Amino acid sequence: MDKEYVGFAALPNQLHRKSVKKGFDFTLMVAGESGLGKSTLINSLFLTNLYEDRQIPEASARLTQTLTIERRGVEIEEGGIKVKLTVVDTPGFGDSVDCSDCWLPVVRFIEEQFEQYLRDESGLNRKNIQDSRVHCCLYFISPFGRGLRPLDVAFLRAVHEKVNIIPVIGKADALMPKETQALKQKIREQLKEEEINIYQFPECDSDEDEDFKRQDAEMKESIPFAVVGSCEVVRDGGPRPVRGRHYSWGTVEVENPHHCDFLNLRRMLVQTHLQDLKEVTHDLLYEGYRARCLQSLARPGARDRASRSKLSRQSATEIPLPMLPLADTEKLIREKDEELRRMQEMLEKMQAQMQLSQAQGEQSDAL
C-alpha cells in the first residue's frame, strides 16, 4: 500500500510566499578613507544611484572634518522580490590631520542599533520590530600602501566583534596582477597576526552541487576582494558594451573576473551569503552583546553604573545597558492595563449574552 500524501512537502512553498510578500531588508556599512571608490562601488553593486545629491567638501575643509554617520535607503525590486537596502556611510573617516579615536562614532552607532533592537525585543509590543542592525561592513583598504595601516588595524580591532567585516581593496586597477596578489597575502597575514576576525564563510554541505562548491572556493580565495567600480558603459571593440573604465592602455571591465573580484563580491553579498550574514549578526554578534548586557545588569550596582555611563558616554567600548525611561515604561503599562480592561468587559458581555440565550432556550423548552 502506498504511503498517503499528507502535504508537508508544501512547507517550503509556504515559507517562500510569506518571505516574498514580506520582503527582505539588509543594512550594509561602508567604511574607509575618502577617494577609494566606496560610493561608486555601491552604485555598481546594486545598479542604483544613492549619492546623486552628495556634495564633496573642499580639500581644505577635510583637514578638520569630523566623521559623520549617514544612512541612505532604497527599495530594489527584481523578479518580484523586494529588498529594502540601507547603506550606512562614514564620510570623514581618516580624513582629518588627527585621526585619534575617529572610529569611535562608528562603534557607538553599531552598538546603538543593538541597543535599540534589544529595547524593542524586550518591550511589550513586539509585532513590528524594525531591524536596523548593521549586517555587514565593507572596509576599504588603500591599494597604494603596503598592507594595513595603523588606522586600519585600530578600526578593525574596535568593530570585529560587533559586525561582519569584509575587507575590500579599493581601486584595484591601480595594481598589476602580481602586486594585487602580494597585497592580498600581506593583508591576510596582518589580519591573522593582529587576531582580527573577519566574516567566515560557512562550510558547504556535502549535497551541494559542484558548481556552487567551486564558486564558494573562488570567493574564499578572493578575500580581500580587489574591486573596481564604474557606472559608465564603454565600448572596447567587443560585441557588446560593458561597464568599466577606459584608459590609454586599455579598458578595465568591472564584471570581468580576470580584471577584478567585483563579480565574486556581488555574488557573495547578494546571491549566496546575504541570509547567512543576517543570521550571524543575530545569532552570534547580537546574542553576544545581549549576553554582556544581561551579565552587567546581574552584577551588584550595575544599574547605577549604567545610568552613569549613559550620561557620560566617554567610551564607545562601554556596554550601554538598554533600560526604558520610566515615563515610557509607565505609559506602556497603562496602555496594557487599558487593553486588559477592555478585554475583560468584552468577556463579561459575552458571558451575559450566553447566559441570556441559555435562559431563553430553557424557557422555550418548558413551553
Curated annotation (Swiss-Prot):
Identify one Gene Ontology CC term for this UniProt entry: cell division site
Family matches, as InterPro entries: G_SEPTIN_dom, P-loop_NTPase, Septin
Residues bearing Phosphoserine?
206, 248, 307, 315
Residue ranges of the region described as G3 motif: 89-92
Per the record, the GO terms for biological process are: cytoskeleton-dependent cytokinesis; protein localization; regulation of exocytosis
Domain Septin-type G: start-end pairs: 22-296
Q: Is Aminoacyl-tRNA synthetase one of the keywords?
A: no
According to the lineage, what is the superkingdom? Eukaryota
Question: Which residues are annotated with the PTM Phosphothreonine?
Answer: 251
* Membrane spanning residue stretches: none
Q: Where is this region: G1 motif?
A: 32-39
The answer to whether the entry has keyword GTP-binding is yes
Function field = Filament-forming cytoskeletal GTPase. May play a role in cytokinesis (Potential).
The similarity annotation says: Belongs to the TRAFAC class TrmE-Era-EngA-EngB-Septin-like GTPase superfamily. Septin GTPase family.
Protein name listed in UniProt: Septin-1
